[in-house]
Amino acid sequence: MNRVILFHFHFFKNAGSAVDYILEKNFGDRFVKKEFKLWPYYENIKEVIKWIENESDAVAFSSHTARLFDSTLLERRGIKIIPIIFVRHPIIRIHSAYHYERKQVDIFRPGPVIARNTDFKGYVEIRLAIPRQEFNVSNFHVFRLADMLHGEKNMKPLEKALIALKRLPFIGLVEEFEKSMTKLEETVREYFPEFKASVIRTNVQFSPDMPLEERLKIIKNEVGKDFYKKLMEINEEDMVLWEKVVDMYKEGF
């Protein structure tokens, strides 16, 4: 390959600001960010690939809205891509997104507008009811990871996402952030030997030291037992994916 790049697919409220900080600290002005229209899918990845090619001096890229794609699309152009992706307990991710977006008083995208005008339960219900907003609160990780096999029409999203998980050279876990940084450093140093992945926390809504069970209890008390059950049901596939990544970290993959 003529070129190796790092691409942070910045999944909202999955420690992405910390990852961007690390990339910028390592690469300075060779780290770039940009956002895209999520749909149509093929137009999105066309624009993402064009961006990568046009930013010929850049080494590290980051975007909330770049869709995941088959790496061979870049390899044909002589570019090797190392995707950087983090996953998180799906219910906690949605809860963090809600509290973060409530504070965005000058932003008028759907998420912040909804969050500022309703409680957490209402936030979930409204986003579920709006076409192309529902993925934000229902199987978000599966939706995003399945993009790697977007063209496989005979496969279910969870099946695609689990295959993507196996193909990715790196997958981070917010709940194991320090271990994730070690793994990221090992992965990137194969191509950039001086790379350092320091452990930092930014845009934190709740204490990172709060036990997961305690955070889930807070959410359950906030929305009630019945709605919490619904939250779990509409994120059932995301839970399967998250638990798979948890197991990978337990096994020291």
Curated annotation (Swiss-Prot):
Signal peptide residue numbers: 1-15
Keyword entries, A-Z: Signal
Molecular function GO labels: sulfotransferase activity
TM region positions: none
GO CC term (a single one): membrane
Name used for this protein in its record: Uncharacterized protein AF_0307
Organism listed in the record: Archaeoglobus fulgidus (strain ATCC 49558 / DSM 4304 / JCM 9628 / NBRC 100126 / VC-16)
Lineage: Archaea, Methanobacteriati, Methanobacteriota, Archaeoglobi, Archaeoglobales
